[in-house]
């Protein structure tokens, strides 16, 4: 198992390009596709890459020309690699060039664990093929699709949290990065907001949870081979969804110091329209912050209703 393919000298690449003799316009389009594949899927077999390109550009390139191009790209310096299984696994048999994969550098630059995890996540899932115009937008490293859910979150950050336009752009980018890269996006985003010392009222927090859940479930994921979680759920009849959120240390400290009213938050959670899993998890955390037993106390016949209305239960 070798580390990475060697980067060839410019003179060698020039000779390979001259031998291939494709028009510059075609070469540029192929590079755009490979960059888009690396960003959108992070891991994509060359066979699938050729299928997409051929389907969207009839007669553009033959299979032999595609393989020759991939050999050139394999030995250039990009943010992705063209790798074979025998370069990723011990004792793997040597593969034909068309059996190699486009692999984003983030999966293999430190070690191969991220690659193995991505391969496991993608296994058995169908491939989402976007229309050509939309697909090629992903050649930009941090392209963010202009969806209803992105616009809704942007509006929340602008009008409810009073962020500047620069802060909004950075924050949305961070959210998308967390959603696509983290196994527990709500925990990660809670820690991110905590680091930035962003505290929300109970109303803001309730709205944020809904918006972030929608954003998460409607963002294209490399793990899902380009599908959003909701698309894949509809396609396969079920998909893991987010069902919890953790309070960060600054928010916890605000509760303990009295800066944030824990009882008001509790009432807001109970009266909210959040999913029950969210409610129960957040109430459990509030009880832990207070130092109480997390086991709910049995409510008696004449005890006040836990909704905070003051009525008898």
Q: Each PLM stretch: what is its role?
A:
Residues 1-313:
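Acidic/negatively charged segments and metal-coordination signatures
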């Amino acid at each position: 198992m070798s580390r990475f393919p060697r980067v060839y000298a410019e003179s060698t690449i020039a000779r390979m390009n001259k031998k291939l003799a494709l028009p510059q316009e075609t070469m540029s389009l192929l590079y755009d596709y490979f960059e888009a594949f690396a960003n959108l899927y992070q891991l994509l077999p060359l066979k699938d890459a050729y299928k997409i390109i051929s389907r969207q550009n009839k007669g553009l390139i033959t299979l032999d020309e595609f393989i020759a191009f991939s050999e050139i790209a394999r030995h250039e310096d990009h943010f992705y690699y063209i790798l074979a299984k025998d370069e990723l696994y011990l004792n793997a048999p040597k593969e034909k060039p068309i059996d190699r994969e486009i692999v984003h550098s983030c999966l293999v630059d430190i070690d191969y664990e991220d690659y193995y995890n991505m391969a496991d996540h993608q296994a058995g899932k169908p491939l989402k093929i976007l229309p050509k115009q939309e697909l090629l937008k992903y050649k930009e490293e941090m392209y963010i699709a202009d969806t209803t859910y992105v616009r809704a979150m942007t509006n929340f950050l602008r009008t409810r949290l009073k962020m500047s336009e620069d802060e909004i752009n950075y924050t949305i980018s961070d959210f998308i990065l967390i959603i696509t890269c983290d196994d527990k996006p709500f925990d990660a985003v809670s820690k991110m907001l905590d680091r930035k010392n962003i505290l929300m009222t109970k109303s803001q927090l309730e709205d944020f949870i809904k918006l972030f859940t929608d954003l998460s479930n409607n963002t294209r994921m490399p793990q899902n081979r380009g599908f959003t979680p909701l698309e894949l759920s509809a396609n396969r009849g079920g998909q893991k969804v987010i069902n919890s959120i953790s309070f960060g240390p600054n928010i916890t400290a605000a509760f303990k110091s009295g800066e944030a009213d824990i009882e008001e938050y509790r009432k807001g959670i109970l009266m909210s329209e959040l999913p029950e899993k969210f409610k129960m998890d957040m109430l459990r955390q509030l009880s832990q912050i207070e130092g109480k037993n997390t086991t709910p106390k049995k409510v008696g016949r004449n005890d006040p209703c836990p909704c905070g209305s003051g009525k008898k239960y």
